[in-house]
């Protein structure tokens, strides 16, 4: 049995293509220890000055201490997972604010990454990530969502990353059905190899 952390970030609830794909992955991974964190239904606080002070490990106020405790909890969930499933829809060419806030809270110096003479080094090595992307249009792999997800995951040490795309969902019901079928086929391939 493996520990799996599922991050949902869509604001569209059950209508979300990435949430539907995440639920499909959860169904395929039954029998594993699965933790689901819905960043839209349980939003994190806005990452502000107090949060920045907290994640640097220098909390002084009650608010900063609470934010550090939240960061610790999120990082513990992530550290416990061998596999990370991330729903990352494209909103205005980038990831949802909720997902960006999550990474702001877990990207902590000397905890999930460190600086070395050769640059930054991620400390969460040996994990797999599957990123579920949904795009209204058609985009190549140079899109900002893919590039951001590769960069931030690599920054914290997760380099075994696979992407599943449901593209063209803005073209209507037939396009959604086709995109979902294609994405589910890709998920089946990935899950079979886990």
Curated annotation (Swiss-Prot):
<feature type="binding site">
    <location>
        <position position="10"/>
    </location>
    <ligand>
        <name>FMN</name>
    </ligand>
</feature>
<dbReference type="InterPro" id="IPR029039">
    <property type="entry name" value="Flavoprotein-like_sf"/>
</dbReference>
<comment type="subunit">
    <text>Homodimer.</text>
</comment>
<keyword id="KW-0520">NAD</keyword>
<dbReference type="InterPro" id="IPR023048">
    <property type="entry name" value="NADH:quinone_OxRdtase_FMN_depd"/>
</dbReference>
<keyword id="KW-0288">FMN</keyword>
<comment type="function">
    <text>Quinone reductase that provides resistance to thiol-specific stress caused by electrophilic quinones.</text>
</comment>
<dbReference type="InterPro" id="IPR003680">
    <property type="entry name" value="Flavodoxin_fold"/>
</dbReference>
<dbReference type="Pfam" id="PF02525">
    <property type="entry name" value="Flavodoxin_2"/>
</dbReference>
<protein>
    <recommendedName>
        <fullName>FMN-dependent NADH:quinone oxidoreductase</fullName>
        <ecNumber>1.6.5.-</ecNumber>
        <ecNumber>1.7.1.17</ecNumber>
    </recommendedName>
</protein>
<dbReference type="GO" id="GO:0009055">
    <property type="term" value="F:electron transfer activity"/>
</dbReference>
<comment type="similarity">
    <text>Belongs to the azoreductase type 1 family.</text>
</comment>
<dbReference type="InterPro" id="IPR050104">
    <property type="entry name" value="FMN-dep_NADH:Q_OxRdtase_AzoR1"/>
</dbReference>
<keyword id="KW-0560">Oxidoreductase</keyword>
<comment type="function">
    <text>Also exhibits azoreductase activity. Catalyzes the reductive cleavage of the azo bond in aromatic azo compounds to the corresponding amines.</text>
</comment>
<dbReference type="GO" id="GO:0016655">
    <property type="term" value="F:oxidoreductase activity, acting on NAD(P)H, quinone or similar compound as acceptor"/>
</dbReference>
<dbReference type="GO" id="GO:0010181">
    <property type="term" value="F:FMN binding"/>
</dbReference>
<feature type="binding site">
    <location>
        <begin position="90"/>
        <end position="93"/>
    </location>
    <ligand>
        <name>FMN</name>
    </ligand>
</feature>
<dbReference type="GO" id="GO:0016652">
    <property type="term" value="F:oxidoreductase activity, acting on NAD(P)H as acceptor"/>
</dbReference>
<keyword id="KW-0285">Flavoprotein</keyword>
């Amino acid at each position: 049995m493996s520990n799996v952390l599922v991050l949902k970030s869509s604001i569209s609830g059950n209508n979300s293509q990435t949430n539907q794909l995440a639920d499909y992955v959860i169904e395929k991974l039954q029998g594993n220890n699965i933790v689901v964190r819905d960043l839209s239904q349980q939003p994190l606080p806005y990452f502000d000055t107090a949060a920045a002070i907290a994640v640097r490990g220098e909390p002084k106020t009650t608010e900063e201490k609470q934010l550090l405790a939240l960061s610790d909890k999120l990082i513990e969930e992530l550290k416990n997972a061998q596999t990370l499933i991330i729903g990352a829809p494209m909103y205005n060419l980038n990831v949802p604010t909720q997902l960006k806030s999550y990474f702001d809270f877990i990207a902590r110096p000397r905890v999930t990454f460190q600086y070395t003479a050769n640059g930054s080094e991620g400390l969460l090595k040996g994990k797999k990530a599957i990123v579920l992307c949904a795009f209204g249009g058609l985009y190549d792999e140079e899109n900002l969502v893919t590039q951001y997800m590769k960069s931030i995951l690599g920054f914290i040490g997760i380099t075994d990353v696979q992407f599943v795309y449901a593209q063209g969902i803005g073209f209507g019901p037939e396009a959604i059905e086709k995109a979902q079928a294609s994405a589910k086929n890709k998920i089946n391939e990935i899950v079979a190899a886990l």
